[in-house]
Amino acid sequence: MGGKTFMLMAGGTGGHIFPALAVADSLRARGHHVIWLGSKDSMEERIVPQYDILLETLAIKGVRGNGIKRKLMLPFTLYQTVREAQQIIRKHRVECVIGFGGFVTFPGGLAAKLLGVPIVIHEQNAVAGLSNRHLSRWAKRVLYAFPKAFSHEGGLVGNPVRADISNLPVPAERFQGREGRLKILVVGGSLGADVLNKTVPQALALLPDNARPQMYHQSGRGKLGSLQADYDALGVQAECVEFITDMVSAYRDADLVICRAGALTIAELTAAGLGALLVPYPHAVDDHQTANARFMVQAEAGLLLPQTQLTAEKLAEILGGLNREKCLKWAENARTLALPHSADDVAEAAIACAA
């Protein structure tokens, strides 16, 4: 049985899980073995087994803002989950652990530290999460997607994204020959964003019919009917879907995206080369989505529109002032931020640490 065994630790959100899956693919393509440490009753428990990866789980949930009882139980829970993680590491003879963030990352990383197993961490956001901040003290390598997430030199690798997104043609090639209305993609994540679903149709209704962009709007789970009804009631044409299964084509065909500013979204926008109107989720931990958005805005790859300032009138004003030339410039600037070999860079760093 050749190859080394790596334990990936990631959970809670797609922003942690999908970059880790990209690294898992890279490790396996090099002949190594991968197991996954996640939380019980979690998103990763539903997603990871679909990729033919062995999933081990711990009974742990977050503690930030989750009540006094859970915080009082934390020392006992941490002791128990660290012991369980140690058993998992021993059972599978793990030679290196890679932490991507989420509640499960800390006990898994602490277990590795106590057993003398090398730790690599990868931070997806512009503001490092709590688990990764703690583990960075013990990590053999600290890798990150945004320049100021950590001060460790040589760790900037970007966020792993799917190769088919990175392999899209450059913006100038995609935009060539486009005429007529702008085509705008609206995505609020898999669950949708109610504020975008409400405000975007209202903003379009304020524009003259001949100035309205062509819209492709992902509603999010369970929200398609109400979104389509809002567009219809306002007399605005839009193509609405509950969930976009082919994001590669959606990115390829769009001139601009209206979206949140999660780490995975920013990574995909830069990999594809697409400008965006970014409306950060205001309740994200440490307001990391605003920091993520600033990364693109500082490169003149889009606009940051705080949710508190998002009104139909403001959005209509912005959309009315856009043209394809500006969208192309934003798209080209976004593409310059891409680090397309991120998954391989993380995998190679971990392999070196396990040597």
From Swiss-Prot:
Molecular function in Gene Ontology: UDP-N-acetyl-D-glucosamine:N-acetylmuramoyl-L-alanyl-D-glutamyl-meso-2,6-diaminopimelyl-D-alanyl-D-alanine-diphosphoundecaprenol 4-beta-N-acetylglucosaminlytransferase activity; undecaprenyldiphospho-muramoylpentapeptide beta-N-acetylglucosaminyltransferase activity
E.C. designation(s): 2.4.1.227
Keywords: Cell cycle, Cell division, Cell inner membrane, Cell membrane, Cell shape, Cell wall biogenesis/degradation, Glycosyltransferase, Membrane, Peptidoglycan synthesis, Transferase
Record's subcellular location: Cell inner membrane
Top class in the EC scheme: transferase
InterPro entries linked: GlcNAc_MurG, Glyco_trans_28_C, GlycoTrans_28_N
Record: residues binding UDP-N-acetyl-alpha-D-glucosamine: T13, G14, G15, N125, R162, S190, I244, Q289
Bilayer disposition of the protein: Peripheral membrane protein
Domain of life of the source: Bacteria
Pfam families the record matches: Glyco_tran_28_C, Glyco_transf_28
A cellular-component GO term for this protein: plasma membrane
Principal localisation: membrane
Pathway in which the depicted protein is active: Cell wall biogenesis; peptidoglycan biosynthesis
One GO term of the biological process aspect: cell wall organization
Catalytic activity: di-trans,octa-cis-undecaprenyl diphospho-N-acetyl-alpha-D-muramoyl-L-alanyl-D-glutamyl-meso-2,6-diaminopimeloyl-D-alanyl-D-alanine + UDP-N-acetyl-alpha-D-glucosamine = di-trans,octa-cis-undecaprenyl diphospho-[N-acetyl-alpha-D-glucosaminyl-(1->4)]-N-acetyl-alpha-D-muramoyl-L-alanyl-D-glutamyl-meso-2,6-diaminopimeloyl-D-alanyl-D-alanine + UDP + H(+)
Position of the signal peptide: none
NCBIfam families: murG
Function of the molecule: Cell wall formation. Catalyzes the transfer of a GlcNAc subunit on undecaprenyl-pyrophosphoryl-MurNAc-pentapeptide (lipid intermediate I) to form undecaprenyl-pyrophosphoryl-MurNAc-(pentapeptide)GlcNAc (lipid intermediate II).
Family statement drawn from the similarity comment of this UniProt entry: Belongs to the glycosyltransferase 28 family. MurG subfamily.
Protein name, UniProt field: UDP-N-acetylglucosamine--N-acetylmuramyl-(pentapeptide) pyrophosphoryl-undecaprenol N-acetylglucosamine transferase
Gene: murG
